[in-house]
């Protein structure tokens, strides 16, 4: 694994986005970055210091593409979502802090891949953001649980994995939410795993469900319109630009 490999992967992704824009006439935004699971796997074969150095080079390369407008966000970055040794966990947090500092310096958002340990995960991330001088709203928790209350998220932005029962939980916590949030499917487009994780049609389906749940909860048509416009248009433009 070399920085040239990352450059090739990034440019392949950018080219795919260009082809889709030209063929279908739709807006496609690109997120680039080295995945934290890749870091955890590679350090066992390449070495912790050597691969951490390469990982940071890959982050800086992604930031260069963002600065030229070819990508809109750095990600997924973060830390392993599964148990690791204390040494690796500490190194992963130190690495994430350095990545956040680079993002803060570049004034860009990051999409974060982390473990699901409830409010503690958000608390940890918020402290890292503050230490790195990265505004919390520029740290976007990917594959987030449906509790979007600010007390739970600590002011981080979230994209909720909208599986079954997610909409009820979103509506329940919405009155206590003062942060940016959105919907996601984590769709893989893997021919060997059709539909994984959730298919693209899930978003309009869940949007309709959200509309109905908000009506049942007493929200007015204007309030519902504002919520839907924010999560599907206004806030993505703020976070991914």
Model-predicted segments: where are they?
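Mid-domain alpha/beta scaffold segments of enzyme catalytic cores
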Residues: 1-106, 112, 122-134, 141-149, ...
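Gly/Ser/Thr-rich loops at beta-strand to alpha-helix junctions
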Residues: 116-119
């Amino acid at each position: 694994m070399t920085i040239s490999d990352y450059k090739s992967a990034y440019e392949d992704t950018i080219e795919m986005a260009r082809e889709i824009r030209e063929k279908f006439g739709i807006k496609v935004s690109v997120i680039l970055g080295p995945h934290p699971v890749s870091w955890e796997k590679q350090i066992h074969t390449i070495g912790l210091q050597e691969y951490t150095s390469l990982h940071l080079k890959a982050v800086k390369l992604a930031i260069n593409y963002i600065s030229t407008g070819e990508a809109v966000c750095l990600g997924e970055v973060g830390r392993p979502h599964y148990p690791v040794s204390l040494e690796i966990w500490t190194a992963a947090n130190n690495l994430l802090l350095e990545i956040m500092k680079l993002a803060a310096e570049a004034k860009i958002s990051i999409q974060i891949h982390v473990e699901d340990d409830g409010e503690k995960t958000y608390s940890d991330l918020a402290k890292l953001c503050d230490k790195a001088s990265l505004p919390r709203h520029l740290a976007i928790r990917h594959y987030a649980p449906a509790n979007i209350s600010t007390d739970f998220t600590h002011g981080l932005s979230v994209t909720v994995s909208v599986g079954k029962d997610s909409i009820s939980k979103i509506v329940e916590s919405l009155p206590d939410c003062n942060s940016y949030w959105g919907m996601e499917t984590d769709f893989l487009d893997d021919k060997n795993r059709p539909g994984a994780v959730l298919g693209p049609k899930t978003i309009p389906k869940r949007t309709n469900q959200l509309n109905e749940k908000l009506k049942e909860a007493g929200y007015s048509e204007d309030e519902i319109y504002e919520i839907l416009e924010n999560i599907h248009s206004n806030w993505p433009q703020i976070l991914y630009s």
